[in-house]
């Protein structure tokens, strides 16, 4: 927002619903002008973030596409790796790192710049230790998958290739903090350029491993390690070699202080996001226990891949909204945080509607990117309606979660996710899938309408009833608390 509207006193802010008119906009030259200003601010973050998300996710999609043309078993194994082994850990570590959006975003808004570098170093340590604790999921992937009901051939192949993605697992610990560190400083173009370079390298390496050296499924998965670590190398060099002079002041012994308190905050963020992320991973695992599991897993994994690809857009809005809300609250501007929320939700919903229509129109052609099997393509076609509904709901829900991250509500949203997803959605999906014999369509439909839809509705209610002036005050108190804590250490 501009200085005039940003400095306007908020009168009776607590009683004004989120979706009512923005009075400061009229004072600053009209609603349209304020919407345009806020839209530019959001797109400055979201635009490069969308490209970054698409490029990063495309690394896994391209890998899956290569595997799909090797055979149905290979596609199923890669799908399990992406959605279970990597997917579970990705969700937890990304969720824990999202606490940096609250800390760095509000510190940046309050002009406490040096703390961003300290926070990033602390999260490198925290996430690296978490990666060590999560290693058994890779080392014992085969027995774990067999225990939860996956077929022996899929479990054996998945366990073999799981060992080849352990370097990617540890890459998460360094990439996520670097990404949030730069993102909160609005250096999204740097992140996007690095992601684009890494994607281009991955395509070459993947083709070379699979078709040049004929390494098959092992070469396909091994190629994933190269772009992730290249991305980290580029971002690290930029951050530490003059690109962030205000926020990076060198390695600090302060990185080893306050780790326990930050871990507690990270746990709330991790639980909030991973409960949501794991929800759809569990859908994949339950499908593996159905009759004709290979076709069911392949078709659902294709739908989840398309959804995940499109999901990079609302996730960019998740990140952008979190940064905008955190910056405004850190600057003491509750009104600006509220207005940023309105604009961000509206933009994301419009894009979601567009892609929903695209999926409905091209419902019978979606699967051809990943497979040439007629049975798999028909199964994907049958699931396209549910895919469209999922895309539409996900155009709103992540943005609301971004508001939660920017405001520091992670612990509350974690309870909401637990209740909606696992106490309502999951049992509903199981009932529809097995008791009423609707198979994968029943499981997915039950989990969408029983979990995601209810969770989105609750978040809408919470956001519309939010007292934004009070949130700005709490942000100021939180920043002072951490500064005093660091001074004491």
From Swiss-Prot:
One annotated Gene Ontology cellular component of this protein: membrane
MF GO annotations: antiporter activity; xenobiotic transmembrane transporter activity
Primary location group: membrane
A Pfam match: MatE
Record keywords, A-Z: Membrane, Transmembrane, Transmembrane helix, Transport
Domain of life of the source: Eukaryota
Transmembrane domains' residue ranges: 42-62, 75-95, 125-145, 157-177, 190-210, 217-237, 271-291, 300-320, 342-362, 385-405, 416-436, 442-462
Keyword Transmembrane among UniProt keywords: yes
GO biological process, one term: xenobiotic detoxification by transmembrane export across the plasma membrane
Subcellular locations according to the entry: Membrane
InterPro entries membership: MATE_euk (IPR045069), MATE_fam (IPR002528)
Membrane topology qualifier: Multi-pass membrane protein
Similarity-based family: Belongs to the multi antimicrobial extrusion (MATE) (TC 2.A.66.1) family.
NCBIfam families named among the record's database cross-references: matE (TIGR00797)
Name used for this protein in its record: Protein DETOXIFICATION 26
Organism, scientific name: Arabidopsis thaliana (Mouse-ear cress)
